[in-house]
C-alpha cells in the first residue's frame, strides 16, 4: 500500500458502490473521512488510524474490540486496512444484514478458527455484551441474567460450545443479542 493508492478513481468508486451497500455518493463521503484519518497519507489505515477512525464514530465502543475488528477486516493480513477493506467493514457493520453481522462477530471471537466458540471465546463475547449493555444504561445484573439465558438458548445441544450454525440461527432471532453485541 503506497502513495499510488492515496487517490480514489471513478472506477474505484463504481467498483465499491457495486460491491457494497453504499451509493457512489456515500463512497465518496466515506473516502473524504478516510483521508482525514489517514495521517501518513499512504492510502491505508494502520491499527492506530483505524481505531481513531472508529472511535470518532463509536466513542463508547471498547478499544480492544476495535482491535479485533481490525484483525477481522485486514483481509490480506498486511497489518493495514485499505479503503476497499474499510468499505467492506463499514458496509457490513452499518448496512449489512443481521446474518452478515453475526458471521463477522463469530469469526472475530472464533480465534482458533475451529467453527466453534469455546468457553473462553464465549466469555470474551459476554464481556463485550456487558460493556455495551452498561453503556446503554442497563444494570449489570440484568444484563448478566439475560446473557446467561440467551446463551443457554443458543447452545441447543447443551455441550457448552456454540457452533457457528447455532450462533447464526439463534442470534438472528434475537434483536437483543444484536443490540448487546453493538450491532
Curated annotation (Swiss-Prot):
SUPFAM superfamilies: EF-hand (SSF47473). The keyword Calcium applies. GO terms for cellular component: phagocytic vesicle. One of its GO terms (molecular function) is calcium ion binding. Residues 25-60, 61-96, 97-132, 142-177 form the EF-hand domain. Disulfide bonds: none annotated. Ca(2+) 3 binds at residues 155, 157, 159, 166. One of its GO terms (biological process) is regulation of signal transduction. A lipid is attached at residue 2 (N-myristoyl glycine). Ca(2+) 2 binds at residues 110, 112, 114, 121. Keywords: Calcium, Lipoprotein, Metal-binding, Myristate, Repeat. InterPro entries: EF-hand-dom_pair, EF_Hand_1_Ca_BS, EF_hand_dom, Recoverin. The keyword Ribonucleoprotein does not apply. PROSITE patterns: EF_HAND_1, EF_HAND_2. Ca(2+) 1 binds at residues 74, 76, 78, 80, 85. Belongs to the recoverin family. This is Calcium-binding protein M. It comes from Dictyostelium discoideum.
Amino acid at each position: 500500500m503506497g502513495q499510488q493508492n492515496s487517490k480514489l478513481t471513478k472506477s474505484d468508486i463504481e467498483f465499491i458502490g457495486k460491491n457494497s451497500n453504499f451509493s457512489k455518493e456515500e463512497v465518496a463521503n466515506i473516502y473524504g473521512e478516510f483521508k482525514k484519518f489517514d495521517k501518513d497519507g499512504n492510502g491505508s489505515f494502520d491499527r492506530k488510524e483505524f481505531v481513531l477512525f472508529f472511535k470518532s464514530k463509536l466513542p463508547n465502543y471498547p478499544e480492544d474490540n476495535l482491535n479485533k475488528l481490525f484483525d477481522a477486516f485486514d483481509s490480506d493480513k498486511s497489518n493495514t486496512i485499505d479503503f476497499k477493506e474499510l468499505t467492506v467493514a463499514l458496509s457490513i457493520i452499518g448496512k449489512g444484514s443481521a446474518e452478515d453481522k453475526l458471521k463477522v462477530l463469530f469469526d472475530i471471537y472464533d480465534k482458533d478458527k475451529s467453527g466453534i466458540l469455546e468457553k473462553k471465546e464465549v466469555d470474551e463475547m459476554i464481556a463485550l455484551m456487558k460493556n455495551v449493555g452498561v453503556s446503554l444504561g442497563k444494570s449489570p445484573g440484568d444484563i448478566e441474567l439475560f446473557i446467561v439465558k440467551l446463551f443457554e438458548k443458543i447452545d441447543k445441544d447443551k455441550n457448552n460450545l456454540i457452533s457457528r450454525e447455532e450462533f447464526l440461527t439463534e442470534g438472528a432471532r434475537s434483536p437483543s443479542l444484536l443490540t448487546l453485541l453493538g450491532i
